[in-house]
Amino acid sequence: HLVTTGTYSCPDGFPDILAQYRAEDYKIDQEYRNFYYEYDQLEDTEAFERLRDLVENIYTNEYLDKLLPKWNAGLQEEDSLTKLPVQIDFYAHNIRNARERTVVIISDAMRYEVGQELFRLLSDDPKCTAKLETQLSVLPSYTRLGMAALLPHKQITMTDDYQVLVDDVLCDNLAGRQNVLQKHLSNSICVQFDDIKGLKKN
């Protein structure tokens, strides 16, 4: 996919850009990530530096340089935010009315292409029913703001020094996010992955 990206063509208009990305273009990001994963496993990279430079040149100049200007222009279209569910509505659409126990796993910088790979792996498990959906993240795409957007809220604000407040509660750490969540769902908890990983199985 990265080599064929040398002839990459990006459509015009936000709906068509989204459709092409979900159908095909995510594979470019996926292969780019896989390439660097394998490259970083090498003890001696000298023999592969020209290949790395080629991959980087194609990815940056033939793919991103064509995609990003049209993506940014698409976001300026009057109805662009109606083309996808938005991250800021995540709780209202997915959690508020859930009847069963729900676990939300948050991973920093988990792009659609990673989700697509996880979806494929889960779909291969006969005990699992997997579904993949897309959402448009908050802008700016800032980790603390993104995590806050997943919480129940009436308003989210960011201070001049980039502190994120959810309904006037500071949410710059796990305790702050749990405080907000428990105001809406008292029987809920926020935990770090490492704390769960360290638990012993009973």
Task: Give residue spans per PLM region.
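…; additionally, a secondary subgroup of soluble metalloenzymes is captured
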Residues: 1-102, 109-202
